[in-house]
């Protein structure tokens, strides 16, 4: 009996030691991943995003993509305002999450809604597309860190360079060339509002040959872009 008891205690001790070792390695792994992500975020604060998971998926699906990174000062300010008006009118007012929009989306039972430009930038630049609790959790963890490290103008600059404006067409420059044959710097207010109107679904909406829905949406976006310029909600990314 005494031998059995001692053996049982040894087994319990070994199990505890194993559990403690696993916890230590798990914590180290989480710390290492966190540190790696922080380095990644800091790097993208100053260098162009070279590619994304979704871009590579589209490249494999389509056989190629169109993309040309340009700095913010080579993107028409009216496009920046149009995109913010369309996707996240309170972009300059929040810290990564628009709690009012989230509450409204929950109350309305919306499948899509409440996702800020900051969250979309994290999803596009660092993560992957698709509905997943894992991705959502990572997005929620990374977004406030990115907001602390990057100025708002940089967040929008990255977003405008990695967002898809047509199937396999990424970024404002490639989108402007694809739809209108002009550079992103030379977009008119009308063209900018049409490009912003396709962002929720660039696979089905076409800025170059807009449907009635896209035209109506573009007119609304143009009004919104003028409004956020007038009331100061575009100040955080203005030249």
Curated annotation (Swiss-Prot):
Q: Name one GO cellular component term.
A: peptidoglycan-based cell wall
The annotated pathway is: Cell wall biogenesis; peptidoglycan biosynthesis
Which UniProt keywords are present, listed alphabetically? Cell inner membrane, Cell membrane, Cell shape, Cell wall biogenesis/degradation, Glycosyltransferase, Membrane, Peptidoglycan synthesis, Transferase, Transmembrane, Transmembrane helix
Its GO biological process annotations read: cell wall organization; peptidoglycan biosynthetic process; regulation of cell shape
Source organism, top-level taxon = Bacteria
Q: Where are the transmembrane segments?
A: 29-49
UniProt record similarity statement: Belongs to the glycosyltransferase 51 family.
Q: What is the official name of this protein in its record?
A: Biosynthetic peptidoglycan transglycosylase
EC numbers, comma separated: 2.4.99.28
The record's catalysed reaction(s) read: [GlcNAc-(1->4)-Mur2Ac(oyl-L-Ala-gamma-D-Glu-L-Lys-D-Ala-D-Ala)](n)-di-trans,octa-cis-undecaprenyl diphosphate + beta-D-GlcNAc-(1->4)-Mur2Ac(oyl-L-Ala-gamma-D-Glu-L-Lys-D-Ala-D-Ala)-di-trans,octa-cis-undecaprenyl diphosphate = [GlcNAc-(1->4)-Mur2Ac(oyl-L-Ala-gamma-D-Glu-L-Lys-D-Ala-D-Ala)](n+1)-di-trans,octa-cis-undecaprenyl diphosphate + di-trans,octa-cis-undecaprenyl diphosphate + H(+)
Q: How does it sit in the membrane?
A: Single-pass membrane protein
């Amino acid at each position: 009996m005494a031998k059995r008891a001692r053996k049982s205690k040894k087994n319990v001790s070994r199990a505890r030691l194993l559990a403690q070792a696993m916890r230590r390695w798990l914590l180290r792994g989480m710390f290492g991943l966190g540190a790696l992500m922080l380095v990644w975020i800091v790097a993208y604060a100053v260098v162009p995003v070279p590619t994304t998971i979704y871009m590579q998926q589209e490249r494999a699906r389509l056989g190629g993509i169109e993309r040309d990174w340009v700095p913010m000062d080579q993107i028409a300010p009216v496009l920046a305002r149009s995109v913010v008006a369309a996707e996240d009118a309170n972009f300059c007012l929040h810290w990564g999450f628009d709690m009012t929009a989230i509450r409204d989306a929950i109350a309305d039972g919306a499948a899509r809604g409440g996702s800020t430009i900051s969250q979309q930038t994290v999803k596009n630049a660092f993560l992957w597309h698709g509905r997943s609790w894992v991705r959502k959790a990572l997005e929620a963890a990374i977004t406030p860190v990115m907001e602390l490290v990057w100025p708002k103008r940089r967040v929008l600059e990255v977003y405008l360079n990695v967002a898809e404006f047509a199937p396999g067409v990424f970024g404002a420059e490639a989108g402007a060339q694809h739809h209108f044959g002009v550079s992103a710097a030379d977009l008119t207010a009308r063209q900018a509002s049409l490009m912003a109107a396709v962002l929720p679904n660039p696979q089905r909406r076409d800025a170059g040959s807009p449907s009635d829905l896209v035209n109506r949406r573009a007119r609304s976006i143009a009004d919104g872009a003028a409004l956020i310029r007038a009331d100061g909600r575009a100040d955080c990314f203005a030249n």
